[in-house]
């Protein structure tokens, strides 16, 4: 047990994920990974490694009584650990019926929206700046490897092969260096120790964590990878999780370096301020102009600058499409913008190029400007 706790502390310290000044909201489903996260975070709070810890559970109401039992289990877990508890009810099926969206996509969006709202209220209650707050998720080595294979199958950019980030804004994944099997063993050993200072909860059937039966349905992409592909890969390499995670960390380190270079390059090749209104405050959503110098960059750097530019315009949660990045780089040839080039890309953004550069802006702004011209 000490090894798991020590490994998590090492990850938090080395990656500078959080400290005693950071209140932490845990996203807890009741499964083995998030249940272990709750126990570990409770210990880290007691040791002064983290600020005040609270639990959040989002009930999607997709599995009837089982979903309600999950919520009751997590609430009991919070009570036993003497930690604040947030419960959010979401009608995912109702939203899917109204919008036609995928259930998993709605569930993910609602979970993170609920976490953002709960973290804001938690920090306000503690009189702590929101920027200090952290949201801990229970993603493990297993999740990271599964994401790697999923992206390998459907395709991704070079940075996508780093898989999950240890931190993305307030969202932190402190268990990415720990396997699911290790976490389950940690819970079992904690239960066997029967230590009143380190309590363990059971559900109504005596289980140490909740199992979601739908996780075994291999018609779902992640479950297919988890139950079909990863076990086959482990036959060839029993140390698959450690091996692939080391490789992903190497990719991540190089990706970070290239991001720094791209950020520096953006200051030279991206103009966010309208030259007719030089004193106007920058609003990313207004778009920008990629200056002619952009066309002289190596194509991989063009792609990265275009990607980061679109992230700013579309918002940090947007999944930037490869086709949008390609449409931008296609607006340059022979080291300069292609005059007369136009396009319509993700987010209903308009592309238009002349010798001054390639403009990226909302389609409504583009049309208004064209009328004035």
Task: Give short role names for the model-derived ranges.
Residues 4-32, 49, 54, 90, ...:
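AMP-forming adenylation/ATP pyrophosphatase catalytic core
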Residues 1-228:
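Core alpha/beta nucleotide-donor-binding catalytic domains of modification enzymes
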Residues 190-249, 253-256, 260, 274, ...:
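Mid-to-C-terminal catalytic subdomains of enzymes
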Residues 75, 115-116, 230, 252, ...:
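Structural signal for well-ordered, non-membrane alpha-helices
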Residues 68, 97, 223, 238-241, ...:
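Non-catalytic, surface-exposed connector residues within folded enzymatic/regulatory domains
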């Amino acid at each position: 047990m000490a090894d798991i706790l020590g490994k998590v502390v090492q990850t938090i310290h080395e990656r500078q994920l959080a400290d005693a000044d950071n209140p932490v909201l845990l996203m807890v489903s009741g499964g083995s990974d998030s249940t272990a996260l709750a126990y570990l975070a409770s210990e880290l709070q007691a040791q002064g490694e983290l600020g005040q810890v609270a639990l959040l559970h989002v009930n999607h109401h997709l599995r009837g009584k089982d979903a309600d039992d999950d919520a009751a289990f997590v609430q009991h877990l919070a009570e036993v650990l003497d930690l604040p508890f947030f419960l959010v009810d979401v009608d995912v099926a109702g939203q899917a019926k109204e919008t036609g969206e995928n259930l998993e996509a709605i569930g993910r969006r609602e979970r993170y929206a609920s976490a953002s709202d709960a973290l804001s209220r938690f920090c306000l209650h503690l009189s702590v700046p929101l920027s200090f707050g952290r949201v801990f998720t229970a993603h493990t080595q297993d999740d990271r490897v599964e994401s790697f294979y999923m992206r390998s199958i459907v395709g991704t950019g070079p940075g996508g092969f780093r898989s999950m980030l240890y931190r993305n804004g307030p969202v932190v994944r402190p268990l990415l260096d720990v396997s699911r099997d290790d976490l389950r063993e940690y819970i079992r050993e904690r239960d066997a120790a029967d230590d009143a200072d380190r309590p363990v909860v059971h559900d109504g059937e005596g289980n140490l964590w909740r199992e979601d039966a739908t996780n075994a349905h291999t018609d779902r992409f992640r479950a297919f990878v988890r139950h079909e592909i990863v076990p086959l890969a482990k036959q060839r390499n029993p140390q698959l999780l450690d091996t692939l995670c080391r490789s992903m960390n190497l990719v991540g380190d190089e990706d970070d370096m290239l991001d720094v270079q791209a950020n520096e390059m953006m200051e030279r090749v991206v103009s966010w301020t309208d030259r007719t209104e030089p004193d106007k405050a920058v609003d990313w959503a207004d778009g920008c102009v990629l200056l002619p110098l952009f066309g002289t960059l190596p194509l991989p750097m063009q792609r990265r600058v275009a990607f980061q530019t679109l992230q700013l315009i579309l918002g940090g949660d947007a999944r930037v499409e490869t086709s949008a990045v390609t449409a931008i780089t296609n607006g340059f040839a022979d080291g300069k913008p292609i005059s007369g080039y136009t396009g319509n890309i993700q987010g209903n953004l308009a592309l238009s190029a002349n010798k001054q550069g390639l403009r990226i802006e909302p389609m409504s702004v583009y049309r208004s400007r064209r009328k004035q011209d």
